[in-house]
Amino acid sequence: PAAICGDSTLSWKEYDQEAAKVAQFLSDNGVGEDSKVGLYLHNSNQYLVAHYAAFKVMGVPINVNYRYQANELIYLLDNSDSEAVFYQGCYANQIKKIRDELPKVKAWIQYDDGTPLLEGSHAYQDVINNTAPMPRIERNEDNIYMLYTGGTTGMPKGVMYTHGGFVNSMLKTLKGMGVDVPEDLADIKNT
């Protein structure tokens, strides 16, 4: 399996197909290259799918701390220029409070956890059930990856990396730990 979380398991094929469907939905809603996609989700397979879907449209996934209060959420989603936000259903009341303050957001996607769907939002499962997979597109190592800091000394700040730089850094870290991995991104492309 590619991902296991509780009782939910995704094969590599299912993971790729779900992400391709979510990516097509994002694209259909005007989210594309360099667009930011907020992930206000618990650790889950859906978090991984939404994260990968953002990459598939050459977008930038934005990590959102589920403990944030309304003012912190508004700050982070506005500061990051998020154009789509995936959120756990249990946070629908928080989303309802902040939604009008975030006019840049084109699509709100609610993951069903038993909470009624918030008006104006799209149900994650409906996106999966009703969207055809997006065809693969060529991405490059200069695409941006951004991680927001924890905000321990003030409000969180986005730290930007290129995909290539991030992967090369991870390869060097693994190599330093004694793991047999390719030397760099160029070696991966040749395998």
Model regions and ranges:
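Conserved AMP-binding/adenylate-forming core of the ANL superfamily
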Residues: 2-44, 48-52, 69-74, 125
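Conserved AMP-binding loop of ANL adenylate-forming enzymes
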Residues: 39, 165, 177-191
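Conserved AMP-binding A3 loop
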Residues: 11-13, 144-172, 180
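Conserved short alpha-helical elements in the N-terminal third of ANL/AMP-binding
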Residues: 53-57, 172-178
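Short hydrophobic alpha-helical segments of the AMP-binding
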Residues: 47-55, 61, 166
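Conserved pre-ATP/AMP-binding loop-to-beta segment of ANL
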Residues: 130-148, 154-155, 184-191
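Structural core segment of the AMP-binding/adenylate-forming
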Residues: 28-29, 56-126
